[in-house]
Amino acid sequence: MTNIRKTHPLLKIINSSFIDLPTPSNLSSWWNFGSLLGVCLAVQILTGLFLAMHYTSDTTTAFNSVAHICRDVNYGWMLRYLHANGASMFFICLYMHVGRGLYYGSYMYSETWNIGIILLFMVMATAFMGYVLPWGQMSFWGATVITNLLSAIPYIGTDLVQWIWGGFSVDKATLTRFFAFHFLFPFIVSALVMVHLLFLHETGSNNPTGIPSDSDMIPFHPYYTIKDILGMLIMLTALSALVLFFPDLLGDPDNYMPANPLNTPPHIKPEWYFLFAYAILRSIPNKLGGVLALVLSILVLAIIPMLHTSKQRSMMFRPLSQCLFWLLVSVLLTLTWIGGQPVEYPYVTIGQVASILYFLILLIFMPLVGMVENYLLKW
């Protein structure tokens, strides 16, 4: 008799995706981040669901409802900090996942890559709207500053901003709609994740060498299920340590003050995972130019497959490209640091140099070095 997991209409989809899936035999730990992102999404949806049961999306009660969750709800503090720090873990895994794709040439699966970029934008939008919900000082002013950027769009900008606000300033209507969208988006993200996996399973996984692995495949279960479970345990241990010992490490103290439209905080800055993009935005002294640079800092990933000049897919055997890749990582870390600093000399200059370097490396240096490596290998 054939196993039920291979015949049942629903089980056979799960079977072909997570059990009998033929997988390259040499995947490193960098391939763990996909499953870790799935765990992060599940944690965020579950904690978010329980938080939404106690949260009120009204300007007069939002801040107090979060305080009520932390003080009066059973394990409410834990739910709140799991959700807030879970977002940080989500972005750590996201950036590692994208970095893996860049390093090993996974972007050559263009459908999977493009859905991934849409997912990145969606998760960033969700996180931004979630940061507004506690209605602290940084929530309010972050919402005001970031939504105001849309006013840089010629002709329709001002109308667009007022349409998003639901009035002439960030107020009750804004908070209510942000809560509605923040609740909705993770479910759209879940659907897109399915599409992401669908496209991935059309081609099969890439591997560290970048060489087709059709001749050497192993079943996903038990080899990679056990490997993924180890990764999950490590990540959940790190998240638990963060939540239980340093819950406010990555947050902003200003957000413990209720939103006050009459008092601007001295330094308005987003959560740490947006600081690199914020630094790029601030490094251009023109409003529209800054907004374009901000969007392009992520959208640039979409043209990476077109700029692939090397005859080899992965960077595993390309030391010059490896140097450039790690330079890019250091530039991004520099931008993250600059994004959290005040707008004054020398931070402004460092931010401008790092922003220019970021785009130069991705758009010009990497394709050039790929061609140089081809020449050196007489290809």
Swiss-Prot record:
Its main location: mitochondrion. Heme b b562 binds at residues 83, 182. Coiled coil: none annotated. Keywords: Electron transport, Heme, Iron, Membrane, Metal-binding, Mitochondrion, Mitochondrion inner membrane, Respiratory chain, Transmembrane, Transmembrane helix, Transport, Ubiquinone. Heme 1 (or BL or b562) is low-potential and absorbs at about 562 nm, and heme 2 (or BH or b566) is high-potential and absorbs at about 566 nm. GO terms for biological process: mitochondrial electron transport, ubiquinol to cytochrome c. Heme b b566 binds at residues 97, 196. Belongs to the cytochrome b family. CDD domains: cytochrome_b_C, Cytochrome_b_N. Its cofactor is heme b. PROSITE patterns: CYTB_CTER, CYTB_NTER. The cytochrome bc1 complex contains 11 subunits: 3 respiratory subunits (MT-CYB, CYC1 and UQCRFS1), 2 core proteins (UQCRC1 and UQCRC2) and 6 low-molecular weight proteins (UQCRH/QCR6, UQCRB/QCR7, UQCRQ/QCR8, UQCR10/QCR9, UQCR11/QCR10 and a cleavage product of UQCRFS1). This cytochrome bc1 complex then forms a dimer. A ubiquinone binds at residue 201. One of its GO terms (molecular function) is metal ion binding. The lineage of its organism: Eukaryota, Metazoa, Chordata, Craniata, Vertebrata. The keyword Metal-binding applies. It is found in: Mitochondrion inner membrane. Binds 2 heme b groups non-covalently. One of its GO terms (cellular component) is mitochondrial inner membrane. It comes from the Eukaryota. Component of the ubiquinol-cytochrome c reductase complex (complex III or cytochrome b-c1 complex) that is part of the mitochondrial respiratory chain. The b-c1 complex mediates electron transfer from ubiquinol to cytochrome c. Contributes to the generation of a proton gradient across the mitochondrial membrane that is then used for ATP synthesis. It is a multi-pass membrane protein. This is Cytochrome b. InterPro entries: Cyt_b/b6_C, Cyt_b/b6_C_sf, Cyt_b/b6_N, Cytb/b6-like_sf, Cytochrome_b, Cytochrome_b_C_euk/bac, Cytochrome_b_N_euk/bac, Di-haem_cyt_TM. The chain crosses the membrane at residues 33-53, 77-98, 113-133, 178-198, 226-246, 288-308, 320-340, 347-367.
